């Protein structure tokens, strides 16, 4: 089970637990629900993405963050803040742009807003590639040079990140491996329950990697 971005509470999950139905959470999870989980360290991955922008010379970095409730959006926001703090860059809440929905159109709208406000932003960490591609599309339309004027990095490593111009730097989230691990955990729980044995929930954490591409790779 991967929670919807619109999920605000967990009673339906608790009902599954109370009925002893085997299930595994992956990707978007409810941390406090005691089930098996397949996760990545969103906070660490986001911190590494923002650190890459800083290493490329960015000093005023915006964050297009996800919705308020999903745990992965919260963790990525915290990773953004941690990277700034570790590099002595003051956090500015005015550089955080919360999505109302995770869409290409949101990326376009925030790109417009960033250009109109003209705050001197030179780097953007975006919650996910779909939104980041919207940002790049608008910057391309307006003649903004990426990464020379503004560097952009996304998250997820969707196929779309490699077909946009410039190619999008992103964080590789191992989706296939996540699916395999979730299936194996679910199968293990089903087998154990059929044998009448108790089952201790397990947590599998998969590694992520910053994929450096054209949207951040500045010439030094």
Task: Identify the function of each model-found stretch.
Residues 1-5, 67:
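Structural motif
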Residues 10-220:
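Bacterial carbohydrate/catabolite-sensing allosteric modules
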């Amino acid at each position: 089970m991967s929670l919807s971005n619109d999920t605000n509470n967990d009673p339906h999950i608790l009902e599954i637990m109370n009925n002893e139905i085997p299930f595994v959470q992956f990707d978007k999870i409810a941390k406090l629900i005691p089930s098996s989980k397949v996760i990545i360290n969103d906070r660490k991955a986001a911190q590494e993405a923002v650190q890459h922008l800083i290493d490329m010379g960015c000093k005023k970095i915006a964050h297009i963050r996800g919705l308020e409730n999903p745990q992965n959006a919260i963790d990525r926001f915290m990773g953004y803040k941690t990277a700034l703090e570790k590099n002595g860059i003051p956090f500015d809440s005015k550089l955080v742009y919360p999505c109302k929905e995770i869409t290409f159109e949101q990326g376009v709208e925030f790109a417009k807003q960033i250009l109109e406000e003209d705050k001197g932003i030179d780097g953007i960490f975006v919650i996910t590639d779909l939104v980041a591609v919207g940002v790049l599309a608008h910057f391309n339309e307006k003649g903004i040079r990426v990464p020379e004027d503004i560097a952009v990095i996304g998250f997820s490593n969707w196929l779309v990140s490699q077909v946009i111009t410039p190619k999008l730097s992103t964080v590789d989230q191992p989706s296939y491996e996540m699916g395999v691990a979730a299936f194996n955990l679910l199968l293990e729980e089903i087998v154990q329950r059929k044998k009448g044995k108790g089952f201790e929930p397990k947590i599998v954490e998969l590694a992520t990697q910053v994929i450096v591409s054209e949207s951040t790779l500045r010439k030094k």
